[in-house]
Amino acid sequence: MSYPLMISLIIEHMIGLTDAVFLGRVGDVALGACALGGVYYMAMFMLAFGFGFGAQIIIARRNGERRYNRIAPTMVQGCYFMLVLAVALFAASQYFSPIILRDIIESPQVYGATVDYLHWRTYGIFFSFLCVMFRAYYVGITQTKILTVNSIVMLLSNVALNYCLIFGKGGFPAAGIAGAAIASSVSEAVSLLFFIIYTSMTADKRKYGFRRAFTLRPHLLKGMLSISGWTMVQSFISVSIWFIFFLAIEHLGERPLAVTNIVRNISALLIMVISAFATTAGALISNQIGAGEQRCLFKTCGMTLKLTYAILIPLLIILCLFPEPVLRAFTDSPSLIAASVNSVYVMASSTLIMAPSFILFNAISGTGNTKAGFIMEMISLAVYTAVIYYGIIRLKPDVALCWFSEHVYGVTLIILAWWYLKSGKWRGKKV
């Protein structure tokens, strides 16, 4: 179950990665603006991701309880909510983003490019938010193989459109960073269309309750929000703090920002491996609790961590032995490659800490006690923000040292999550 999800997450991340690869040939400003715009967009997307993760917990629990006819109504009510949320965020972003970013981005060139990117990128909200619900459905019912196929279709469309729209190939005008944003949004529309067609053709509509799922059910949505509300806020704040990290780096200069964007894209590939296993652990734990097997929680976490390290450690060894060839995929500038190597080493070591922190945190979410997870995340992020302020904004160190803030966040979350799970306070939580 983990491997198809892992592959799909890696492929989906490669949408942002291909933006960085293509824009790295345009210049440092475009590369840095892509980083800021990408994380800004991701903060909005994480509201949907948080809601979808809560919906996934509920779907997985119903699947474990064998109450299959409750699954499709949960998914459809989630889609209704996602559409309303997408409209609200799109309107707010189009109006307020230029005003907000003008006051917090120092470089006029980076500001202009970031606004251009976001103007077109936010159109993808409508498609990506609905895709989150389809992903929650397939992960919740433990049928994740289709996610890989969907992600491949999305990636191929994104690569082709990036090439045409950024550089002006195939009869299209050269749109630069705006072209990258348009390509990403259109590829998400392709992904949604694929999900709709596949689900309508293959889903067991009677078993999962699709035939009567489209009636608006406010009481069901209210129950979903009681679980998903905490994960929504937690996910949004988590990435918003990551945006603050990028803003702190931007104040160090355009070159450190370009370095950080490259390292972020490499880091995100590794985090996708961790996230796939952690998400699977959360879904399995929710299924196990639904089936009355709470005792399996720690065994599931331990097995998941071993499998994660089995893939992660060889990748880290290769990355640390050969950082320059990996960096060359993002830029052809020798000076930018040289400036990024030390940051790669620090980032690589942080992923070893992120693996257990993500798995333990998702285990808490799998128990259904998302409020406890929210509190732990807020404490960890408060510590992380303090490190960003004092360690980056005040001290202005070399960009590689800035990446040690990831270690602090990971260790804090491990301590809190381990304490909570060992306390047994999660037992008996109803979903």
Where are these regions (language model features)?
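Interfacial/gating helices of multi-pass transporter permease domains
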Residues: 23-42, 74, 108-113, 177-178, ...
